Amino acid sequence: PLAQYDLKGSDYVTLCDYSAIPVTISGDYDVTDQDVLDYVEKIFTQGGPFYTADPDKTTVEEGDIVNVDYVGKLDGEAFSGGTAEDQNIDVSNNSSTSGSGYIDGFTDGLIGASVGDVIDSNVTFPDEYPNNPDLAGKEVVFTFTVNSIQKEVTMDTMDDEFASKQFGADSVDGVYKQVRQYLESSAESTHKNDVYSALEDYLLENCTVDMPADYRSDVIEAIRANFIDRYCSGDESQMETVLSSYGYTEESIEQEWSDSVESSIRLELIVKAIAEKEDIQIDDTEFEDYVSTIVSSGGFGDADTLYSNYGYGDYVYGKNQIRVIYLAGLVLDKLAETAEITENAVEETTESVESTESADSTEE
């Protein structure tokens, strides 16, 4: 079993000098006012359209977006899936503003209605209605409550009330503040990931590892068995066909597995060796919190499923691997404190420069 390979790093690793690792990273880690404006614009162009009540409109006309509550009834009884609240409906296109279409005639009764009206609309479901066969061909009554007639909101017309309702911000300025915080957090995370990736590359290149061959071959075999179980229904004879559908041969995938496993084991042993030398310990409570976060964000259901997944079916080995990942974070935290970090600004590509010059040449 893979669980036997809970190895001591210092038995296999000759460490390099990691007291002041030189790291060079390239990226745009600063957030400008323009970045914030661009992101808010992206929210409205890609996440919209957004709407709010138009106090100047009281009667529904063709082309309007109407906010309604509705209840659908068959023979006087509300039916499943026929009730909704706070729905924005495009009356001209007989659809929701998200683009979902309604059955023919659904919005016909709304034209001419006033805000505050409660109206009944008789609608017949199509003879074939796979979403709910019990309603196929049936005449039903939808009772609409007209809450408001809507108007579109853009980033320029957004007000504090809309900012609160749509984005949970206390004001329009609060929306921009939220976006800046998000972008700065993302930039900080990217910066950290770039530094840690460079630190890992340095350690792999400069530390010497005596590769435990049995460990390496057993992990590769476990990956292979797991692949056959998950993607070939346990039938090894299907492996060639399945791999070809992904553009692989058995030789190419096994080479990829081999390279990946070797790099992973080397980094695992280096991390352990540094942790042993620096007496970096895992706090069990903090580790449990870390595991809970992974389980929740990764949709694993519970820790046992997480461990089994990372251990290729071996629960104990999987838990050990998660501990190694967590330990690696602690080790890299320490190395980053003393690393000599050089940040290179991202250079404009030749194409973008030429594009700008071309655009400038057309201006008068």
Each model region followed by its residue ranges:
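FKBP-type peptidyl-prolyl cis-trans isomerases
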Residues: P1-E364
